[in-house]
Amino acid sequence: TATPTNPFNEQLVSGGSSSGSAVSVSRNYCIGSIGSDTGGSVRIPAAWNNLVGLKTTHSLIDLTGTLKLCPSFDTLGPICKNVDDTYFLFHGMKKRKFQKLKKYKVSDFKFLIIKNMFFDSIDSEINDSFNSVIEKIIKNGAKVEYKSVSEIDNAVEISKIVFPAEAYGMWQHEIEKSPEKMFAPIKERFRSGQHILAHDYVFSLQQLFEFRMSFLKKIMSFDAILAPTSPIKPPRITQLIDDHKLFTEKNLLALRNTRIANSLNLCALTLPTQTNFSGLMLM
């Protein structure tokens, strides 16, 4: 089936590989759906359809019966219109006994905003929306700190080796059996893992584990990290089809912020804001 268009503007894309899940909720076909998130494919469709999307902690939800992309990063999570429905569906996926969602005051929390990377090349409307939300949070008593964290940059660089190595390793036979059937920019992304050596992959994965531990030590005093879910709004479909270079550029930029949570093995939640396509991500 074809990728669905965006319900809020049919000239725009609706998200990543779980876009069908998000559009189904946005168009009221269901109250909730399930998506997969390896680098942002629950959170980007949720944000670009003004929905709530939860990227769960790696290995928390059983992946039996799913098609793997990158086993070290693959997760499943719910997409719904509000937090209550998301919480309910998450409990069903986890097979937990449902417990009533606790209510907290914003003033109970201490948030971190990481200055490096998350705001590079950000759309002005997305940036304004994020700053507006932060102003409201501070006004309501929350503590907010800004700081740079080097592990963010390190983890993203390392993931450029680990992601393609695993993805090509999982799908090489299907791709090379009929390469002409695959969208060229995506095929080349997969093939970028073709020549990564096993010892480089193992070393990079070990480095990533070390960066994760170091990162967690630095953020332990905070309740959550706040960031824009994506630095850009959904692009026009025709632009991406006609310009493969632009497709790759927009695809990588759209997923840049969300992939950080996957690389560092964080759970992450995107919430809709008052601005269309401008999700607020908590990690």
What are these model-derived regions, one by one?
Residues 75, 92-161, 182-183, 195:
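Gly/Ser-rich, acidic/histidine-flanked active-site/gating loops
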Residues 4, 202-203, 234-255:
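Short, surface-exposed loop/helix-turn segments at secondary-structure junctions
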Residues 216, 248-272:
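Small-aliphatic-rich amphipathic alpha-helix that forms the alpha element of a beta-alpha
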Residues 124-148, 172-177, 201, 205-222:
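Acyltransferase
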Residues 108-110, 162-216, 228, 267-281:
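Short helix-loop capping/hinge segments that flank enzyme active sites or metal/cofactor-binding pockets
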Residues 1-90, 262-274, 279-283:
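Short glycine/serine-rich loop segments
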Residues 31, 223-225:
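Conserved acidic residues
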Residues 117, 230-233:
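Short glycine-rich anion-binding loops that position phosphate/pyrophosphate groups of nucleotides
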